[in-house]
């Protein structure tokens, strides 16, 4: 009978507690205090108020130290009675106040967890959750032992209400072995308010069968503990054992315990499955099982210890002892040596202490009611309980005392997960997945997506990803040839497969190795395989070797990995041919192993075969799956089995997922079907998926027995399948596993068909799995139906395979596998060993007995950092989705970074090492950023602070990331920050010498946090708004690579390289959709933004550049910028040939942001232009850095400029814009010379001189940031002015490779606008000599397009070398030339090609070095393929100077010197017949300003004709007199006016720079020159007054120009503003009149009527859009003089900016310029007229074609109808004949 004992009010000492008091229990790792006594229920089943831990009233663990006089105490019986009065134990307990494991109920554990934040790991509160491990454990305990019923307030109708009812009826019931971790993991019904009642077994059987062992054995155990620990601690350990929580996993019961319905994942006890009640019951009834009673008890106690370990290791008191180990050892999990590199994930979970504690538990495990049987049994019990509860007078069924008639199947109470829909109902012991669930992930972005249970997907259909799911991660050490291979098609991940099991097969079999077997006294039979292999020699440490080790125990978890010889302490010398003694390696890795028990295995095939079976027993590539057919109105098992024939909907489904095969003679996997006599049917369904064979047991294809309702022949097969598909026709009732009776069916996949047998047929899916099977993928999208397609088939088959793999991890199958493994090991240890010990030398080493033993030398520090396997650290990770901290293992291998939850033993995070972009280390914390800025947060465990340093070192070795930098950014007087940011958070351009630049921000940097807000959660617009509106802007950035390329995750990089725009988007952060939603920019229409059609046209010429840029091999080539995967660039290059590579990625990105102030994102067209311009600009910048970088920088600079999206070029171009005059003038030249001379001069001097001020130079210094040196000002609103700069960007096409991602994005930042805003000041600077300096750096960048050129960096360098003939000037011109080349080539290849030309042009360049535009021209000229480049270049120019670009860019910025020059209106691109003229025209904006893009155009069109004109323009622009004839020619060819700023910007700039510029005309020209230095060269100078070409080839333009002057630019010219220069250029190069970039303005002396000019301008604007297309059309050029042709091309390119911007500079220039400009206007008008006529003709042709197509379509339809009618008639005739026959 149950006895009651009064409990003192101050606390009750339970026998099991050993006198522990509630108050004595310390919080901490232990569970902490229990809930108030009033809430304690007998079995802890009673629901408890929030905040209180569930009472763990298990008899064993009942130290219900609740101070409640009203609560009855546990009865003192048997062992309990004797132990309870054990004073030492009581004292010990009180001292340590350690709650017994049993006490660690869910609630208590929850307290612990709260302490460690782990308890809530799964997001479930520890409070009275049914799954709480502690309570579960107790429930199991009570159930197994006494099955006593818990009563809420004591026994009904009994005074015992004031007493705590006893849980166990006899001492035997109290045995600790009964408290299984498994029990703990399962929620007990009592815990659930609505739970089913617990059942109690009456009679002696319950006490006798619980444990068939004498009590004496238990006392023996106690004595062992006492002998081991005579002090109070031993006592405490015992009490803890008695009270031990059945399972450590339970501790997280709320969080991830088995019963956790949230994750639906059972909490498993380490590797051992929790033992179901049934198992326990069996154990009771069959105690012997070949093990002595003592063994059984022993094992059960240790099992409990082991189970509690994982959960509350930290909280566990040192008193807990492991078998044979000191309590402290047992209390903590075993930690492997850090220098050991794990081969796979499960190896990281290997716990030697756990293996020792569980060594006896395997034999005790019993089969339990699992799978569908558990659900059906639960439903039967529920009905029985309900009826009995009713007879008990309304007592809560949870507390009724009823006898469980089927004691063997005493199931813990489980109510299911209340997750139902039309396909599936909630069911006890099962967990449902109905859509929207996603796998658990602790990363930051997951928190923003929602909790793990919230749908991640909502996709129309599941999408295949380059990333691996957490459950699919197995092998961590990946051979180089297999790392991140993207060539293989993406497929759904196969999950829960221990692929590491092939370690022995792949690395040992067939190679020299040694196997050792033995029986360890603590671990039982063990098997060790060890092998030494040579690695590549180390530069400093000589030969390198490593030891591969496999250590197998009874547990399924195996230790697999390797350790470097240098990382192993030994007394032997490292690196010798003989190697270290194997003993040293094993003792270091597994010090607890008794090495002396090992014996060498026999060298026979049997040993190898047995080891392979042992290791790979869990690997299977053959699966059998049942399919049940459920018709409308059906739901029961009998109904489904009795469906004799399949309906058409079912047949349709079967034909989709597999192939019907004839069984007779079938040779493949038959799944136990008869292939000889057809006894199991004649046909079956078979298929293969990812090398897995699947045979389906289809109910309608199996034999039907008319008189047998159970259809045993069918159920015999389907009932033994682990996974079953339930196919439901429309109208079928929801499925529930309660209707199925099978111990094996653990997973049901419900598929319902909609609109069967129609074209709109689709399927919906739901899954239900046994609660102890972990979740598996692929996740079902929320509210999604699948079309009938291969996508659905693959999804379903992957789900089926993963379902069976997951079910094998359930307790039932885990136990079976463990037993099998134990037998294998036992056989090997007993029958396959020799007598040779592992340390044979020790026997003869007698000297060691007397002489001093040689000390082992320490391992080389840090040697393991280069191991290929995963180095592991214990850390505490922040689970953002659940808001808790969890104990984890961090592993970093050569391929993966993974986090494993110690409690649930599952991977909770993984990413490729190539995906890591940076980290933020602190003294004890670490934030690791990956992908687009997502991150995980780690904290070192107590006393392991040095781990953070080791982790960072490992990240440096294995990843390409870098430490983050915190910056506080200031605003300028206009409120601008001075940089542009792309949609993916990378910085597109940085205003040179602006506050952001001074703070260290560089192009290519990646923003990961803005004002403490993670960028990964922001859209581009939100990013910009945050930057614009924050009072104090604090950012965390990840520096770019040395070449300026932004750091990106490898999938993002791969996507970009594929140049699929889609990929770009994939990499977009959750919030980071391309900022430019308008596709014009994204499409890379560039100028196409104003005219998408032209863009495509241009695309053809610019395609090469585009392709490269798109391919975005950033680092590898200038193309790199393109690599930014903006497939759009291809479009953009089309319109922007000159910026092909740069433009598309970098240019596009930048332009929109710059051009469009904050609105750049919103306006696609404008954005496109902006991007476009930025591209050239970037190119410019990049070339400049190239120079400054020298060979290295030339490459890096480009890469840097490009790589980041504008990289250096973008930076420089911006910078030039900012300091337009000097920058534009000098930089153009300087750049040219710098770029050109970068091979020779490398613009080192220029860098030094200008570099100081010039961001480019700086960028050189800091290659990472160099790309940012550009002058872009980030002010959010300044984007429009920057847009003009961006126009120069087109030269940066190389940069696009980086840009692809940022392309669209960069435009959005209002930064550019700011730049322009600051531009006025910059302009002034530009005017000053100093601009020259900046120019050089920017120039070099600008010239080559910097990053743009990156793709052709090497080419660029070559060009520079070629140009080197004119050392300073030539070098600069070269730089420009290369940039031009990039633009001209319109593809990185073009660039490369351009590089050949540049050599010729060097001389030209040298003469024209003064002109920034010249650089571009040079590119054109350089390319003897000028004609080929010339055509593209106009397009590019045009693209680079779209109207929007001009309008957006504030004139002031652009107007700086270079800008003013671009006054000449970009003529409509004339036929490229005259390459020089074309180039010239291109060089200048429509207004005649030199443009960077123009220079690109120049590349397309020969610049030779323009050389003189461009030269003049460049000279004037840069104010350098050094331009040589060659340079002049180059200048003419590639007018730098290509870069254009907004008219207003340019006008402002020009006004500032010079009076002439100030004039309205001057302002207009300024716009073109806004294009940046290059724009001056790029556009024909005809619009502008002739530049002072005369100038000395070397005079510097200004301070900045001085270095440039060295290059050959006249100092005097350095003063000239861009507009001025552009005017001058116009004189020098009449050819430039053709420039279509900006509308050229006539001189006042020209005698042109204003009205005529206005009309011309309007026409020009209109035509310009057309001309962009026509620019590509060389045919136009024939009509017009060569000069015109360039102009036209420029016009078309600049269509976006076509605003006729009168070039104020024109007035300044002699009438000649005006005349030239007038001529240019005439040419443009003529071109426009021609284009218009062509369009009209085309329209007529198209209309006629459309009419013809309509007629043909009508005719075809009629014919089709006639044919159908004939076929119908034939069919009728055929049918009639058939019937007649």
UniProtKB/Swiss-Prot annotation:
It is found in: Apical cell membrane. Residues 54-73, 1196-1210, 1266-1281, 1599-1609 have a biased composition (Low complexity). Residues 966-1042 form the PDZ domain. Residues 1720-1774 form a coiled coil. Residues 611-828 form the Rap-GAP domain. Residues 87-97, 1245-1261, 1509-1518, 1625-1635 have a biased composition (Basic and acidic residues). GO terms for molecular function: GTPase activator activity. GO terms for biological process: cytoskeleton organization; epithelial cell morphogenesis; establishment of epithelial cell polarity; eye development; hematopoietic progenitor cell differentiation; regulation of small GTPase mediated signal transduction. Residues 45-166, 239-332, 1046-1112, 1124-1221, 1236-1565, 1583-1636, 1685-1712 are annotated as: Disordered. The modification Phosphothreonine is found at residues 1387, 1699, 1703. It comes from the Eukaryota. PROSITE patterns: PDZ, RAPGAP. Plays a critical role in epithelial cell morphogenesis, polarity, adhesion and cytoskeletal organization in the lens. This is Signal-induced proliferation-associated 1-like protein 3. It comes from Homo sapiens. The gene is SIPA1L3.
């Amino acid at each position: 009978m149950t006895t009651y004992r009064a409990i003192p009010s101050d606390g009750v000492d339970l026998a099991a507690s050993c006198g522990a008091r509630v108050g004595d229990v310390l919080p901490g790792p232990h569970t902490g205090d229990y809930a108030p006594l009033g809430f304690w229920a007998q079995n802890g089943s009673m629901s408890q108020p929030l905040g209180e831990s569930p009472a763990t009233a298990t008899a064993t663990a009942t130290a219900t130290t609740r101070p409640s006089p009203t609560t009855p105490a546990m009865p003192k019986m048997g062992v309990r009675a004797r132990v309870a009065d054990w004073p030492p134990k009581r004292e010990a307990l009180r001292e340590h106040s350690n709650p017994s494991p049993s006490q660690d109920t869910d609630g208590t554990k929850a307290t612990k967890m709260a302490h460690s934040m782990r308890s809530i790991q799964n997001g479930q509160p520890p409070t009275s959750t049914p799954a709480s491990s502690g309570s579960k454990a107790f429930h199991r305990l009570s159930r197994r032992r006494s099955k006593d019923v818990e009563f809420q307030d004591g026994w009904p109708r009994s005074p015992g209400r004031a007493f705590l009812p006893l849980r166990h009826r006899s001492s035997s019931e109290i045995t600790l072995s009964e408290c299984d971790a498994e029990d703990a993991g399962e929620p007990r019904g009592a815990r659930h308010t609505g739970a089913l009642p617990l059942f109690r077994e009456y009679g002696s059987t319950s006490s006798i069968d619980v444990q068939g062992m004498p009590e004496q054995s238990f006392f023996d155990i106690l004595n062992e503990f006492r002998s081991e620990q005579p002090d109070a601690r031993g006592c405490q350990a015992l009490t803890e054992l008695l009270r031990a929580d059945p399972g450590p996993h339970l501790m997280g019961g709320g969080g991830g315990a088995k019963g956790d319905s949230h994750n639906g994942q059972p909490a498993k006890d380490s590797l051992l499955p929790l033992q179901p009640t049934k198992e326990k019951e069996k154990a009771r009834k069959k105690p012997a099982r070949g093990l002595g009673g003592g063994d059984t008890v022993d094992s059960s106690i240790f099992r409990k210890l082991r189970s509690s370990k994982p959960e509350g290791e930290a909280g566990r008191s040192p008193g807990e002892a492991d078998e044979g180990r000191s309590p402290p050892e047992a209390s903590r999990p075993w930690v492997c040596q850090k220098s050991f590199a794990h081969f796979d994930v499960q190896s990281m979970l290997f716990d030697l202490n756990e293996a020792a504690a569980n060594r006896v538990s395997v034999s005790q495990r019993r089969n339990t009611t699992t799978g569908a049987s558990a659900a059906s049994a639960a439903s039967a019990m529920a009905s029985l309980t309900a009826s009995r509860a009713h007879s008990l007078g309304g007592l809560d069924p949870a507390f009724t005392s009823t006898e469980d008639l089927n004691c063997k199947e005493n199931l813990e109470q489980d109510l299911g997960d209340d997750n139902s829909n039309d396909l599936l109902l909630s069911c006890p012991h099962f967990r449902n997945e109905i859509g929207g669930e996603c796998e658990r992930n602790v990363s930051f972005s997951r928190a923003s997506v929602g909790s793990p249970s919230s749908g991640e997907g909502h996709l129309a259909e599941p999408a295949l990803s380059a990333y691996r799911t957490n459950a699919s991660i197995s092998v961590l050490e990946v051979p180089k040839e297999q790392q991140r291979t993207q060539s293989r098609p993406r497929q759904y991940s196969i999950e829960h497969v221990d692929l590491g099991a092939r370690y022995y097969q792949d690395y040992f079999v067939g190679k020299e190795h040694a196997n050792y077997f033995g029986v360890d006294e603590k671990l039982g039979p063990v098997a060790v395989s060890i092998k030494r292999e040579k690695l590549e020699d180390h530069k400093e440490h000589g030969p390198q070797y490593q030891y591969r080790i496999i250590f197998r125990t009874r547990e399924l978890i195996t230790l697999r990995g390797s350790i470097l010889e240098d990382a192993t302490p030994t007394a032997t010398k490292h690196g010798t041919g003989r190697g270290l003694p194997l003993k040293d390696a094993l003792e270091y890795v597994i010090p607890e192993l008794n090495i002396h028990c090992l014996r060498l295995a026999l060298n026979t095939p049997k040993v190898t075969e047995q080891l392979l079976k042992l290791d790979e027993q869990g690997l299977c590539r053959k699966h059998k799956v049942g399919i049940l057919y459920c018709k409308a109105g059906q739901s029961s098992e009998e109904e489904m089995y009795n469906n004799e024939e399949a309906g058409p909907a079912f047949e349709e489904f079967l034909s989709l997922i597999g192939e019907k095969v004839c069984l007779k003679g079938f040779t493949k996997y038959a799944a136990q079907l008869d292939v000889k006599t057809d006894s199991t049917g004649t046909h079956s369904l078979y298929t293969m998926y990812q090398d897995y064979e699947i045979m389906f047991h289809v109910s309608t294809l199996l034999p039907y027995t008319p008189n047998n309702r159970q259809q045993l022949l069918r159920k015999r097969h389907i009932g033994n399948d682990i996974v079953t598909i339930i196919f439901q026709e429309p109208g079928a009732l929801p499925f529930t596993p309660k209707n199925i009776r099978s111990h094996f069916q653990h997973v049901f996949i419900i598929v319902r068909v909609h609109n069967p047998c129609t074209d709109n047929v689709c399927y919906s899916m739901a899954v239900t799995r046994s609660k102890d099977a972990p979740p598996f993928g692929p996740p079902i999208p929320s509210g999604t139906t699948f079309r009938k397609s291969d996508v659905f088939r693959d999804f379903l088959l992957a789900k089926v395979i993963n379902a069976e793999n997951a079910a094998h991890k359930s307790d039932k199958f885990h136990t079976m596998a463990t037993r099998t493994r134990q037998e294998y090991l036992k056989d090997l240890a007993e029958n396959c060993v020799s007598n040779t010990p592992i340390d044979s030398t020790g026997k003869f080493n007698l000297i060691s007995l007397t002489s001093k033993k040689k000390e082992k030398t320490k391992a080389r520090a840090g040697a393991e950092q280069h191991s290929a396997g995963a180095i592991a650290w214990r850390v505490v990770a922040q689970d953002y989705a659940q808001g808790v901290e969890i104990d984890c293992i961090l592993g970093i291998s050569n391929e993966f970074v993974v986090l494993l939850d110690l409690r649930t033993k599952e991977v909770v995070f993984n990413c490729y090492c190539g995906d890591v972009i940076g980290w933020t280390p602190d003294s004890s914390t670490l934030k690791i950023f990956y992908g687009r800025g997502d991150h995980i947060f780690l904290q070192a465990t107590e006393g392991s602070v040095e781990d953070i340093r080791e982790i960072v070192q490992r990240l440096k070795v294995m990843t390409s990331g870098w430490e983050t930098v915190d910056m506080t950014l200031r605003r300028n007087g206009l409120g601008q920050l001075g940089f542009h940011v792309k949609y993916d958070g990378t910085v597109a351009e940085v205003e040179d010498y602006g506050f952001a630049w001074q703070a260290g921000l560089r192009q290519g940097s990646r923003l990961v946090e803005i004002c403490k807000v993670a960028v990964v959660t922001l859209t581009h617009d939100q990013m910009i708004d945050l930057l614009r509106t924050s009072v104090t802007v604090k950012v965390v950035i990840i520096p770019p690579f040395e070449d300026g390329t932004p750091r990106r995750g490898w999938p993002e990089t791969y996507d970009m390289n594929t140049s699929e725009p889609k990929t770009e988007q994939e990499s977009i952060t959750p919030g980071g959709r391309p900022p430019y939603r308008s596709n014009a920019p994204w499409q890379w229409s560039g100028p196409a933004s104003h005219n998408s059609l032209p863009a495509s046209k241009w695309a053809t010429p610019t395609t090469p550049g585009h392709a490269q840029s798109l391919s975005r091999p950033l680092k590898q080539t200038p193309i790199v910028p393109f690599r930014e995967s903006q497939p759009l660039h291809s479009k953009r290059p089309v319109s922007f040939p000159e910026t092909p590579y740069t433009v598309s990625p970098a240019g596009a990105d930048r332009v929109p942001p710059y051009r469009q102030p904050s609105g750049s994102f919103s306006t696609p067209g404008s954005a496109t232009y902006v991007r476009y311009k930025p591209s050239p600009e970037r190119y410019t910048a990049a070339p400049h850095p190239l120079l400054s970088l020298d060979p290295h920088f030339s490459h890096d600079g480009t890469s840097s400029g490009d790589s980041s999206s504008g990289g250096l070029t973008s930076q420089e171009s911006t910078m030039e814009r900012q300091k337009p005059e000097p920058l534009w003038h000098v930089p153009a030249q300087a750049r040219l010379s710098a770029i050109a001379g970068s091979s020779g001069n490398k613009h080192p001097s220029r860098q030094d001189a200008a570099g100081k001020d010039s961001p480019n130079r700086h960028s050189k210094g800091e290659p990472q940031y160099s790309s940012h040196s550009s002058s872009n000002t980030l002010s959010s609103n300044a984007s429009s002015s920057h847009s003009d700069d961006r126009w120069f960007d087109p030269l940066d096409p190389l940069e696009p490779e980086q840009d692809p991602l940022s392309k669209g994005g960069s435009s959005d930042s209002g930064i550019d606008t700011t730049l322009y805003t600051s531009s006025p000041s910059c302009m002034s600077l530009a005017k000053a000599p100093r601009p020259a300096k900046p120019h050089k750096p920017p120039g070099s960048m600008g010239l080559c397009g910097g990053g743009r050129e990156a793709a052709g960096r090497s080419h660029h360098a070559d060009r520079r070398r070629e140009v080197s003939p004119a050392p300073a000037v030539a070098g600069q011109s070269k730089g420009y030339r290369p940039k031009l080349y990039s633009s001209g080539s319109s593809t990185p290849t073009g660039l490369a090609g351009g590089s050949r030309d540049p050599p010729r042009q060097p001389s030209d360049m040298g003469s024209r070095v003064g002109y920034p535009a010249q650089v571009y021209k040079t590119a054109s000229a350089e390319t003897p393929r000028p004609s080929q480049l010339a055509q593209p270049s106009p397009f590019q120019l045009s693209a680079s100077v779209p109207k929007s670009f001009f309008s957006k860019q504030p004139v002031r910025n652009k107007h700086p010197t270079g800008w003013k020059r671009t006054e000449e209106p970009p003529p409509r691109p004339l036929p490229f017949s005259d390459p020089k003229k074309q180039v010239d025209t291109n060089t200048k904006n429509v207004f005649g300003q030199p443009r960077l893009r123009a220079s690109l155009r120049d590349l397309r069109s020969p610049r030779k004709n323009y050389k003189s004109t461009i030269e003049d323009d460049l000279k004037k622009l840069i104010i350098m007199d050094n331009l040589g004839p060659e340079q002049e020619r180059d200048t003419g060819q590639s007018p730098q006016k290509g870069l254009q700023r907004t008219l207003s910007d340019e006008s402002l700039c020009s006004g500032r720079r010079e009076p002439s510029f100030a004039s309205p005309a001057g302002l207009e020209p300024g716009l073109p020159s806004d294009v940046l230095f290059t724009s001056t060269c790029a556009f024909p100078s005809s619009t502008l007054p002739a530049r002072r070409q005369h100038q000395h080839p070397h005079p510097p333009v200004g301070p900045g120009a001085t270095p440039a002057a060295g290059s050959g630019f006249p100092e005097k010219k350095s003063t000239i503003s861009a507009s001025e220069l552009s005017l001058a250029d116009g004189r020098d190069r009449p050819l430039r009149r053709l420039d279509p970039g900006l509308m050229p303005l006539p001189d006042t002396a020209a005698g042109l009527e204003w009205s005529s000019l206005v009309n011309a301008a309007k026409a020009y604007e209109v035509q310009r859009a057309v001309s962009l297309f026509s620019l590509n059309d060389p045919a136009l050029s024939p009509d017009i003089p060569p000069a015109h042709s360039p102009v036209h091309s420029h016009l078309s390119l600049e269509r976006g900016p076509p605003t006729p911007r009168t070039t104020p500079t024109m007035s300044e220039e002699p009438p000649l310029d005006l005349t030239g400009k007038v001529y240019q206007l005439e040419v443009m008008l003529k071109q426009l007229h021609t284009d218009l006529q062509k369009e009209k003709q085309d329209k007529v042709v198209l209309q006629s074609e459309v009419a013809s197509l309509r007629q043909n379509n009508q005719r075809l339809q009629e014919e089709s109808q006639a044919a159908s009618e004939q076929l119908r008639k034939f069919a009728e005739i055929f049918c009639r004949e058939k019937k007649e026959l």
